[in-house]
């Protein structure tokens, strides 16, 4: 079991099941861990991506069929797609400050579903983003994957 985390979000596995990703939201960090697919045991973790403070914090996430990790950036007004090397390769701007989770679904797994939050927004911020708390969709070029069930 992982310890020393403040708030863990965005849990997802790579398409081959050999890498586990998660976000430690308060520290602006995405981490990756090698996984033994036979036992499910996690190896040592490594920094996957460090977001700059003030540019959004990684919250919910998912992985697509190319092994890229998608992250919703709380207080960041966007979702990003990161390569397996941890580099941002795509940014999708959102009309809300707090995207909270992204999932890839639909019949072809090419529809992105992004939830958002309106929590603790000032009256002015709420007026500027009346759809905060809503669900948004957009199409992606690379389909998602069905995440494996957790056996532990």
Regions found by a protein language model. Give the residues of each.
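Short loop/turn segments immediately following beta-strands, especially the blade-tip
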Residues: 33-41, 139-145
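A short beta-strand motif characteristic of beta-propeller blades
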Residues: 1-3, 44-51, 87-92
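Flexible "stalk/tail and boundary" regions
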Residues: 80-91, 97, 106, 112, ...
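Blade-level signature of beta-propeller repeat domains, shared across WD40, Kelch, NHL, RCC1
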Residues: 103-152
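Beta-rich, blade/repeat-based domains predominating
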Residues: 1-19, 51-68, 96-110
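Beta-rich catalytic cores
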Residues: 7, 26, 44, 57, ...
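Structural signal for beta-propeller blades
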Residues: 28-30, 77-79, 120-121, 135
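Conserved beta-strand positions in repeat-built beta-propeller and related beta-rich domains
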Residues: 20-27, 69-74, 113-119
């Amino acid at each position: 079991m992982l310890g020393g985390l403040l708030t863990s979000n965005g849990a997802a596995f790579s398409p081959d099941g050999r890498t586990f990703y998660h976000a430690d939201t308060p520290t602006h960090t995405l981490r990756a861990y090698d996984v033994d697919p036979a036992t499910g045991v996690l190896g040592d973790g490594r920094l996957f991506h460090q977001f700059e403070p003030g540019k959004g914090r990684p919250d919910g996430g998912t992985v697509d069929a190319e092994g890229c990790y998608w992250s919703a950036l709380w207080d960041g007004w966007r979702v990003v797609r990161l390569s397996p090397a941890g580099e941002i390769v795509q940014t999708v701007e959102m009309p809300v400050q707090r995207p909270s989770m992204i999932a890839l679904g639909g019949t072809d797994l090419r529809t992105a579903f992004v939830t958002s939050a309106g929590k603790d927004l000032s009256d002015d911020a709420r007026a500027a983003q009346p759809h905060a708390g809503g669900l948004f969709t957009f199409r992606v070029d690379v389909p998602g994957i069905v995440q494996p069930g957790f056996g532990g």
